């Protein structure tokens, strides 16, 4: 084999999803307890953050000739650790028992990709995986949806910020990650379930929001968020006047107005004000307000409403990323 290290890394990276895919076993002293539903999604997310923190630390140590790159990687490592702590850590099935040395243990946390562009794409792909789970009301309650999406959106924001630091697109490593997956499949006969394969449908892509109006017409969350998006859009021209180099303001304004219109077209109650201006007009404050409006939709019991909020949040994390004074929290919550 010409590239044993790369092959080993491939196996390590892609085994993470397989290790968390949940073989349902009876709980006993000789078998791992069953891990299903939201608990399975939560642990997959936690394992991703643990792997991301480890890889970001190691890459930062190698970036000696680019101090800004090293700083961005260390920031990502810290954010990943915060998200891991927010989730409660990686699943420990025997934490309340003594003498666990001889008991079966979950798979160890696997390694994330080594190359920067592939690492970034891996972060994005895993975020979409978690957001799909968070948008499904049959597998996650509103509270669980907000918890999982808070981590996934924070991870996506970290990917966007790291891509900016290296001046590359967030999807620049998609082909490389796909190649790793193909090598893994050839070696094991299995397909990593977290990968969005090119040219093929996948359970990990976000479903499209349907055009039916019933979910939005009965959603208080959709009505409230629509008002917020419209008001933020009306405030943006004032913010642009008072903020130096806020070149993104018009683009963001148009995106928010379009989002509000699409929400109304789907049946959301129209409670917009003819004239509306927020008191806090800094780009940072407006970005936070917009993300709160997005995440608010995850309190809905409707998959369509949740999906609309998820897509809005992903759009906002990209739209606001270059605005002056704007930074994103490690965990994107309603607060």
Language model features by range: what are they?
Residues 1-13, 145, 306:
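N-terminal export and membrane-targeting signals
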